[in-house]
């Protein structure tokens, strides 16, 4: 049931999800920080699996950087949009395969088929069932070559609770709030797809328990998390200050506090 709701939600999002990561300076923090750390850890060349790649925003960037990429996603509408933008960006030769499916079953791929796997924008978190999430992690590991990087980003539970306080205080009295607070589980019905909201240490332990080496934890919005209006105002009105803030963000985003409060955070891992 949860998977059907996730598919329905993202089929309805359409071009909105394509625009999400570049809508404004605040949203670009997630996108640009993810790219920064991928550049840091990806091999110089190779084949990358974009698991839960949606409309292809990351895949296209990787294609432009010279990587070969396979997009794999649950939503047929997202994949339709991905095909369109892959053509528009003229990276068809790099992003040559676009496949529909759930990330907890990557059976269409052989073991150790990829030089890196990325699972960004919280597709793992959209699997509410814990056993299926663990299977998805196992699959991301299975299809990655030994020694290759694995990138996983999710939505942070503390940031979700703060969002409820600031933007949706009426929901605090509803049963959904303590459920998220105590378990991280959200089964839909309040304007967003079903999701498991993570604590940073929870994600780290889950990945390590499945056999990955966690190299870094990264707060993608970091200290700016929850301050969309202020972030966008700084970027728009004070470009010099914004440059300094970006430098500050990169210096602080791997600190435990920044990861903990971030709306999205990413684990940078390596398969032993």
Give residue ranges: language-model regions.
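Class I SAM-dependent methyltransferase SAM/SAH-binding core
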Residues: 57-105
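Acceptor-substrate binding/catalytic loop of class I
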Residues: 127, 187-202
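Conserved class I S-adenosyl-L-methionine
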Residues: 1-54, 57, 61, 149-179
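A short glycine-rich, Lys/Arg-flanked "PGG" loop and its adjoining helix->strand segment in the class I
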Residues: 134-146
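A C-terminal cap/extension of S-adenosyl-L-methionine-dependent methyltransferases
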Residues: 216-272
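A short acidic, Gly/Pro-enriched loop at the edge of an enzyme's catalytic core
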Residues: 107-116
């Amino acid at each position: 049931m949860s998977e059907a709701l996730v598919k329905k939600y993202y089929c309805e999002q359409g071009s909105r999800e394509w625009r999400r990561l570049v809508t404004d300076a605040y949203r670009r923090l997630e996108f640009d920080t993810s790219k920064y750390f991928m550049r840091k850890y990806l091999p110089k060349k190779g084949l990358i699996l974009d698991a839960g790649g949606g409309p292809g925003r990351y895949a296209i960037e990787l294609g432009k950087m010279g990587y070969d990429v396979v997009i794999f996603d649950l939503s047929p509408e997202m994949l339709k949009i991905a095909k369109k933008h892959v053509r528009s960006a003229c990276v068809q030769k790099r992003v040559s395969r676009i496949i529909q499916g759930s990330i907890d079953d990557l059976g269409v791929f052989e073991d150790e088929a990829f030089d890196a796997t990325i699972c960004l924008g919280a597709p793992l978190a959209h699997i509410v069932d814990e056993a299926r999430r663990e299977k998805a992690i196992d699959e991301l590991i299975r299809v990655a070559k030994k020694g290759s990087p694995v990138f996983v980003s999710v939505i942070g539970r503390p940031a979700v609770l703060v969002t409820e306080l600031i933007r949706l205080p009426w929901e605090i009295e509803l049963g959904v709030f303590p459920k998220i607070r105590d378990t991280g589980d959200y089964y839909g019905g309040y304007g967003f797809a079903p999701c498991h909201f993570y604590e940073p240490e929870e994600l780290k332990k889950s990945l390590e328990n499945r056999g990955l080496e966690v190299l870094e934890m990264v707060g993608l919005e970091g200290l700016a998390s929850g301050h969309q209006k202020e972030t966008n105002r700084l970027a728009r009105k004070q470009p010099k200050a914004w440059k300094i803030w970006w430098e500050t963000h990169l210096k602080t985003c791997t600190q435990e506090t920044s990861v903990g409060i971030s709306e999205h955070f990413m684990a940078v891992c390596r398969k032993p």
